[in-house]
């Protein structure tokens, strides 16, 4: 509808809404890296790879990269440190980073990450070793195959969109949100999950669970991804069981001094 009348405000709203749903697909792809979308692994991987493919993410590659984040949290091998490391850095620093995200200047880094490119810890200037080397030959093969499928899908989609006369709409309403809004959402969520935590050596204080109004939950924390502390303690629990996990841990008084905050507290608002 936004493209039919080409109203700039409606187009901007459409881009923002589509980006939130693209982000939600990445969250489902994340769950599949843990083999937690469906019990049959073939179905888990089929759905996870499909969710990732349409948003430029190689799920099989992300599976390898994301394991390093769990196994080496806050260490030089953690591929997520460029997003969440070194905070607090001040609001102006974050504003500059988000400006770059919204301008599409960090898109190549975002999707290079999902394709297994080594990351650099900006705090220590240490470049991690190639993350895809740290796994089995079978997973390496699956990741390589998946990357070709993702790349092929997007080349084909672009060709078909232009052939059908919808090339501009495809670029504006699918590629542009992926290149601008999605990297910003990923950065903000990473900061909520791990930015400026109290104790990187404690399982209950190195990751953070964030509570927010329902509208913000829909934008920034789809599929219960706000329960990040619980996810790091129990990564085998699927996303739809994380609220139950939180309630059980509350009953057991397991959250003493744990990183559980509102989003306003996380950002010091």
Tell me the role of every PLM-derived stretch.
Residues 25-34, 62-74, 189-196, 221-237:
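Histidine-centered catalytic micro-motifs
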Residues 197-201, 233-234, 244, 250-252:
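Polar-ligand-bearing catalytic/cofactor-coordination segments
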Residues 19-29, 58, 98, 106-110, ...:
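Transmembrane alpha-helical segments that form the membrane-embedded catalytic/substrate-channel core
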Residues 123, 127-138, 204-227:
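Active-site-proximal inter-transmembrane loops
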Residues 1-20, 28, 53-172, 239-269:
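Non-catalytic, topology-defining segments of multipass membrane proteins
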Residues 6-9, 32-40, 118, 191-199:
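Membrane-interface elements of multi-pass transporters and channels
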Residues 37-56, 78-92, 96, 201-216:
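Juxtamembrane helix-capping/reentrant segments at transmembrane boundaries
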């Amino acid at each position: 509808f936004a493209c039919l009348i080409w109203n700039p405000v409606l187009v901007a709203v459409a881009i923002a809404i589509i980006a939130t749903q693209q982000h939600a697909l990445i969250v489902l792809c994340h769950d599949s890296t843990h083999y937690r979308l469906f019990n049959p692994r073939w179905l888990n991987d089929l759905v996870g790879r499909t969710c990732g493919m349409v948003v430029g993410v190689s799920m099989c590659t992300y599976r390898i990269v994301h394991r390093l984040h769990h196994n080496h949290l806050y260490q030089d091998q953690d591929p997520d440190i460029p997003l969440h490391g070194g905070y607090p850095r001040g609001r102006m620093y974050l504003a500059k980073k988000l400006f770059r995200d919204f301008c599409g200047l960090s898109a190549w880094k975002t999707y290079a990450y999902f394709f297994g490119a080594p990351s650099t810890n900006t705090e220590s200037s240490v470049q991690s070793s190639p993350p895809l080397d740290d796994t089995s030959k079978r997973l390496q093969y699956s990741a390589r195959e998946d990357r070709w499928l993702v790349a092929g899908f997007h080349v084909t989609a672009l060709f078909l969109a232009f052939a059908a006369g919808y090339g501009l709409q495809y670029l504006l309403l699918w590629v542009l949100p992926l290149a601008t809004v999605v990297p910003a959402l990923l950065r903000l969520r990473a900061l909520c999950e791990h930015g400026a935590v109290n104790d990187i050596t404690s399982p209950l204080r190195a990751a953070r669970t964030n509570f927010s109004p329902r509208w913000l939950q829909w934008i920034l924390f789809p599929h219960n991804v706000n329960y990040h502390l619980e996810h790091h303690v129990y990564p085998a629990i699927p996303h739809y069981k994380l609220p139950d996990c939180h309630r059980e841990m509350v009953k057991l008084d397991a959250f003493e001094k744990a990183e559980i905050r509102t989003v306003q507290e996380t950002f010091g608002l």
